[in-house]
């Protein structure tokens, strides 16, 4: 270990593993360590089930009705991949897809007036949906056609809207959309967690709705994908990529000290040995003095023996509870997967509810989601701090990832990856850069 590296990475969360993979593909010498004996950090999938009980201090062993412990891979964070989103692009460009199998999530649902409705995924479904009345549907369709044709580089598609100046609120007004439809569009399609976006320039929102529509168009049932065997497979896929390009991996490595000289990182000490480096990437848990708390997320993992009611017995789905519906500032999310994804014993379902904490009683805040899941066989509650780096890391060359937020997709995580990449290299993140070199040594399939 007493060697000189270009980059040392601490923690094997998704952000760290993707950056480690990209740096290795770009010819950097990378050492990647984790204090845990497993991959994934905060974004791990826990197996066997007994380990989940231990992690959440639940007394006793899982009951026999839960089946074999090793049939379970339980994600600590609830996320899906947008079929046309940035993470899927990263997987395709790096060919990490060869190590993974995905399934399309069966449906996306939205909560309105105490009930859940399917988010329409085809024009026929939209016309039949009881989410909105007939005239509202016509106006909404006009709005969707406008969004589909919109191109921020072609003023002919603007129809009097200035993408950099016109607020999204004004665009909704232009199409005469009602409050329910605005809630549904902003939260179930554009996937905003709060309503702050209404007063921002509309370009970002329109592009988010386009991403949703394009993702949906790829597979038809919903815009979301989920990897077999759980989200923990994602960091492992990128770790394999890094290893193929000469990256060195060490799990179960206690990190004793990050060594800084004249304000700049020069190495990492583990088990009495020092590995030197020019740059360091890590998650917040390795540098508690360099991050600050900006909020909290509550997540409740629920084991069920039944699909969620009113989802047409879907074996996987997402439910969004828009904040307006439950008098909150932030949305509540539910992600549900099942034995169909090799993450649970036969006939069992895992539903994870999450939201940004707004009060002193987070468990009360998440109750509307838990009501939809009843009866719940076993639940595991966690409240995590949202941590962000105090500085950009350009002086110390210590680049710290953000903790995973309450959203149910990876678009914000990909934004963080691109941001760190730019700070580390001084150049914009380019998907082409991630392409495997044509004459490289391919990993075994």
Swiss-Prot record:
Pfam families for the chain: GDI
Modified residues (N-acetylmethionine): 1
GO terms of biological process kind: negative regulation of cilium assembly; negative regulation of protein localization to cilium; protein transport; small GTPase-mediated signal transduction; vesicle-mediated transport
Gene Ontology cellular component list: cytosol; Golgi apparatus; membrane
Manganese as UniProt keyword: no
Residues found modified as N6-acetyllysine: 112, 269
Localization, UniProt: Cytoplasm; Membrane; Golgi apparatus, trans-Golgi network
Domain of life, source organism: Eukaryota
Chain positions with Phosphoserine modification: 130, 382
Principal subcellular localisation of the protein: cytoplasm
Gene Ontology molecular function: any one: Rab GDP-dissociation inhibitor activity
Membrane topology reported for the UniProt record: Peripheral membrane protein
InterPro entries from the UniProt entry: FAD/NAD-bd_sf, GDP_dissociation_inhibitor, RabGDI
Keywords tagged on the record: Acetylation, Cytoplasm, Golgi apparatus, GTPase activation, Membrane, Phosphoprotein
Quaternary structure and interacting proteins, as annotated: Interacts with RHOH. Interacts with the GDP-bound inactive forms of RAB3A, RAB3B, RAB3C, RAB5A, RAB5B, RAB5C, RAB8A, RAB8B, RAB10, RAB12, RAB35, and RAB43; binds RAB3D to a lesser extent. Interacts with DZIP1; this interaction negatively regulates the interaction of GDI2 with GDP-bound RAB8A.
Physiological role: GDP-dissociation inhibitor preventing the GDP to GTP exchange of most Rab proteins. By keeping these small GTPases in their inactive GDP-bound form regulates intracellular membrane trafficking. Negatively regulates protein transport to the cilium and ciliogenesis through the inhibition of RAB8A.
Stated family: Belongs to the Rab GDI family.
Name by which UniProt lists this protein: Rab GDP dissociation inhibitor beta
UniProt organism field: Sus scrofa (Pig)
Source lineage: Eukaryota, Metazoa, Chordata, Craniata, Vertebrata
């Amino acid at each position: 270990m007493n060697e000189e590296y270009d980059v040392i990475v601490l923690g094997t969360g998704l952000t760290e593993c993707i950056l480690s993979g990209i740096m290795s593909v770009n010819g950097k010498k990378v050492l990647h360590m984790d204090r845990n004996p497993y991959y994934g950090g905060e974004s791990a999938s826990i197996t066997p089930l007994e380990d989940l009980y231990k992690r959440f201090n639940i007394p006793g062993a899982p009951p026999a009705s839960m089946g074999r412990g090793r049939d379970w891979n339980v994600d600590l964070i609830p996320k899906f991949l947008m079929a046309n989103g940035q993470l899927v692009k990263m997987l395709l460009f790096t060919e990490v897809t060869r190590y993974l199998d995905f399934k399309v999530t069966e449906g996306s649902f939205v909560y309105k007036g105490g009930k859940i409705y399917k988010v329409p995924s085809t024009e026929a479904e939209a016309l039949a949906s009881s989410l909105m009345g007939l005239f509202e549907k016509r106006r909404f369709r006009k709005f969707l056609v406008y969004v589909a044709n919109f191109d921020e580089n072609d003023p002919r598609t603007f129809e009097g809207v200035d993408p950099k100046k016109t607020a999204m609120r004004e665009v909704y007004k232009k199409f005469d959309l009602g409050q329910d439809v605005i809630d549904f569009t902003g939260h179930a399609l554009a996937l905003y967690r709060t309503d702050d976006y209404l007063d921002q320039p509309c370009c970002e929102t329109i592009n988010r709705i386009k991403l949703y529509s394009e993702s949906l168009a790829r597979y038809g049932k919903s815009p979301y994908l989920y990897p077999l065997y759980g989200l923990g497979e994602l960091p492992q896929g990128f770790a394999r990529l890094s290893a193929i390009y000469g990256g060195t991996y060490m799990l179960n490595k206690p990190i004793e000290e990050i060594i800084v000289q004249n304000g700049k990182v020069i190495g990492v000490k583990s088990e009495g040995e020092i590995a030197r480096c020019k740059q360091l990437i890590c998650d917040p848990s390795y540098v508690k003095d360099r991050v600050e708390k900006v909020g909290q997320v509550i997540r409740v993992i629920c084991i069920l023996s039944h699909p969620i009611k009113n989802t047409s017995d879907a074996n996987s789905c997402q439910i969004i509870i828009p904040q307006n519906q439950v008098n909150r500032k932030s949305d509540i999310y539910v992600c549900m997967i099942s034995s169909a994804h090799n993450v649970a014993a036969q006939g069992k379902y895992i539903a994870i509810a999450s939201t940004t904490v707004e009060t002193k009683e987070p468990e009360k805040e998440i109750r509307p989601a838990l009501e939809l899941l009843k009866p719940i066989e076993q639940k595991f509650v966690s409240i995590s701090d949202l941590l962000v780096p105090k500085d950009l890391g350009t002086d110390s060359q210590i680049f710290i990832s953000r903790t995973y937020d309450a959203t149910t997709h990876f678009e914000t995580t990909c934004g963080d990856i691109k941001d760190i990449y730019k700070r580390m290299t001084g150049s914009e993140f380019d998907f082409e850069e991630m392409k495997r070199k044509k004459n490289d040594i391919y990993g075994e399939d």
